């Protein structure tokens, strides 16, 4: 889960995202749809008023059910881009899984891999982002209005340099931490 303590940045556009109200505290739960257990625990938090929104993983084992629950209950969902955890939906297209596996192998190789641009993976990044956006639209009936990433990989060099996040969408930044919360190496990566 994240809170509004994490600053957000909006990708510039002519029309601002209306869903984000200034001064509103957003408590967001990540990994929505990753597994049945994660979805069920998140629903419990939502019903208690502990969270106000979710970041949805698509192409995962519980993505379909999670989307149905979110739509029926009016839960605000953004896209939780996933480049590092294997897609687990039984109907995940093989090419999408293959491109994601190439990306994951590179990004998980060493801790600084995400700050380096990988030109040989440019098409794989485009393909995997597009596939996740298309699946989000299919499941939720709308394009995502906000983005974040599993393991914060939505801020990796390929995503930023290739400008793969749509203009006008809210994007979670992960650069504000309390003193001593992160190691120097971790802060350097961010």
Label every model-predicted segment.
Residues 88-121:
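Active-site gating loops and adjacent loop-to-helix segments of metal-dependent hydrolytic enzymes
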Residues 24-26, 51-55, 74-80, 144-148, ...:
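Structural preference for beta-strand elements that scaffold enzyme active sites
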Residues 35-62:
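A short alpha/beta connector and helix-capping loop motif
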């Amino acid at each position: 889960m994240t809170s509004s303590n994490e600053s957000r940045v909006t990708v510039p556009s002519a029309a601002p995202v209306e869903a984000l109200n200034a001064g509103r505290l957003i408590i967001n739960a990540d990994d929505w749809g990753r597994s049945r257990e994660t979805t069920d625990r998140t629903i419990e938090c939502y019903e208690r008023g502990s969270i106000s929104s979710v970041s949805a993983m698509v192409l995962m084992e519980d993505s379909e059910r999670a989307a149905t629950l979110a739509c029926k209950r009016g839960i605000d969902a953004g896209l939780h881009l996933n480049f590092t955890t294997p897609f687990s939906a039984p109907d995940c297209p093989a090419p999408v899984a293959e491109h994601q596996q190439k990306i994951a192998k590179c990004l998980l190789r060493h801790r600084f891999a995400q700050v380096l641009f990988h030109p040989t993976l440019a098409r794989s990044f485009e393909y995997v982002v597009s596939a996740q956006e298309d699946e989000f639209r299919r499941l939720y009936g709308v394009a995502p209005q906000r983005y974040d990433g599993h393991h914060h990989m939505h801020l990796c060099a390929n995503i930023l340099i290739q400008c793969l996040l749509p203009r006008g969408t809210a994007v979670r930044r992960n650069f504000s931490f309390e003193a001593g919360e992160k190691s120097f190496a971790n802060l350097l990566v961010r």
